[in-house]
Structure formats: C-alpha cells, structure tokens
Amino acid sequence: MSAEVPEAASAEEQKEMEDKVTSPEKAEEAKLKARYPHLGQKPGGSDFLRKRLQKGQKYFDSGDYNMAKAKMKNKQLPTAAPDKTEVTGDHIPTPQDLPQRKPSLVASKLAG
C-alpha cells in the first residue's frame, strides 16, 4: 500500500501540472467564446450551404455540364463502322514514299 501512495501522489501532481499548462489555453478559449458566442454553435455553415449540400450539385460548371451532355450524345448515336482499314505503323516512311510538295503560289520572301 505504501508503494501505491507515491504513485497516486505523482499522478495527482502530473494532473495539476497539466492543468497549469492548459489553463492559459482554456482561459483564452473562454475569452474568445464569450466575445464570439455564435461561432461554435452551427457546424456545417449557413442554411443555404446546408441545403445546397443536401440537394447534391450535379455539375461544377458549364464545362462539366457540356462534357456530360456530349457523353450522352455519344451513347445515343450509333457508331459508324470505319471504312478505312488502314493500319498505321506498318513501316517507316522514306523520302521516296512521301508525296511531292506542291509549289506555293505566293513567292517566298526568304528565297528572294
């Protein structure tokens, strides 16, 4: 029993020390609550904001709306089969494979 008494005393001393440390913070908090009583009452903001959050906003801005609208159009329209079956990347083009450039109608000012 004598071993428990010093531990209890040390626990009480620690509690007193914590109270001394936190008491200035609690005093400052009490001052602020007295000065601004309406701040801590309503978590979640104004009634307008709460109503908007409950309603659930579907689109952030007009860009989101237009993208969703375009997705809906893409789902409704039947996709046309591609008439070109050309596969790209079969070979590396060489200068002989490329078509010739057409001469420009306007004379270049750099060639002058």
Swiss-Prot record:
<feature type="region of interest" description="Disordered">
    <location>
        <begin position="73"/>
        <end position="112"/>
    </location>
</feature>
<comment type="subunit">
    <text>Interacts (when phosphorylated at Ser-62) with PPP2R2D. Interacts with SNCA. Interacts with PPP2R2A; the interaction is direct and this interaction inhibits PP2A activity.</text>
</comment>
<keyword id="KW-0498">Mitosis</keyword>
<comment type="similarity">
    <text>Belongs to the endosulfine family.</text>
</comment>
<dbReference type="GO" id="GO:0045722">
    <property type="term" value="P:positive regulation of gluconeogenesis"/>
</dbReference>
<feature type="modified residue" description="Phosphoserine">
    <location>
        <position position="23"/>
    </location>
</feature>
<keyword id="KW-0963">Cytoplasm</keyword>
<dbReference type="GO" id="GO:0000278">
    <property type="term" value="P:mitotic cell cycle"/>
</dbReference>
<keyword id="KW-0132">Cell division</keyword>
<feature type="modified residue" description="Phosphoserine">
    <location>
        <position position="2"/>
    </location>
</feature>
<protein>
    <recommendedName>
        <fullName>cAMP-regulated phosphoprotein 19</fullName>
    </recommendedName>
</protein>
<keyword id="KW-0650">Protein phosphatase inhibitor</keyword>
<dbReference type="GO" id="GO:0000086">
    <property type="term" value="P:G2/M transition of mitotic cell cycle"/>
</dbReference>
<feature type="compositionally biased region" description="Basic and acidic residues">
    <location>
        <begin position="12"/>
        <end position="32"/>
    </location>
</feature>
<dbReference type="GO" id="GO:0019212">
    <property type="term" value="F:phosphatase inhibitor activity"/>
</dbReference>
<dbReference type="GO" id="GO:0046326">
    <property type="term" value="P:positive regulation of D-glucose import"/>
</dbReference>
<dbReference type="GO" id="GO:0051721">
    <property type="term" value="F:protein phosphatase 2A binding"/>
</dbReference>
<dbReference type="GO" id="GO:0005737">
    <property type="term" value="C:cytoplasm"/>
</dbReference>
<keyword id="KW-0597">Phosphoprotein</keyword>
<feature type="region of interest" description="Disordered">
    <location>
        <begin position="1"/>
        <end position="49"/>
    </location>
</feature>
<feature type="modified residue" description="N-acetylserine">
    <location>
        <position position="2"/>
    </location>
</feature>
<feature type="modified residue" description="N6-acetyllysine">
    <location>
        <position position="109"/>
    </location>
</feature>
<feature type="compositionally biased region" description="Low complexity">
    <location>
        <begin position="1"/>
        <end position="11"/>
    </location>
</feature>
<keyword id="KW-0131">Cell cycle</keyword>
<dbReference type="GO" id="GO:0051301">
    <property type="term" value="P:cell division"/>
</dbReference>
<dbReference type="InterPro" id="IPR006760">
    <property type="entry name" value="Endosulphine"/>
</dbReference>
<feature type="modified residue" description="Phosphoserine; by PKA">
    <location>
        <position position="104"/>
    </location>
</feature>
<dbReference type="GO" id="GO:0004864">
    <property type="term" value="F:protein phosphatase inhibitor activity"/>
</dbReference>
<dbReference type="Pfam" id="PF04667">
    <property type="entry name" value="Endosulfine"/>
</dbReference>
<comment type="function">
    <text>Protein phosphatase inhibitor that specifically inhibits protein phosphatase 2A (PP2A) during mitosis. Inhibition of PP2A is enhanced when ARPP19 is phosphorylated. When phosphorylated at Ser-62 during mitosis, specifically interacts with PPP2R2D (PR55-delta) and inhibits its activity, leading to inactivation of PP2A, an essential condition to keep cyclin-B1-CDK1 activity high during M phase. May indirectly enhance GAP-43 expression.</text>
</comment>
<keyword id="KW-0007">Acetylation</keyword>
<feature type="modified residue" description="Phosphoserine; by GWL">
    <location>
        <position position="62"/>
    </location>
</feature>
<dbReference type="GO" id="GO:0005654">
    <property type="term" value="C:nucleoplasm"/>
</dbReference>
<dbReference type="GO" id="GO:0015459">
    <property type="term" value="F:potassium channel regulator activity"/>
</dbReference>
<dbReference type="GO" id="GO:0019888">
    <property type="term" value="F:protein phosphatase regulator activity"/>
</dbReference>
<feature type="modified residue" description="Phosphoserine; by GWL">
    <location>
        <position position="104"/>
    </location>
</feature>
<dbReference type="GO" id="GO:0005102">
    <property type="term" value="F:signaling receptor binding"/>
</dbReference>
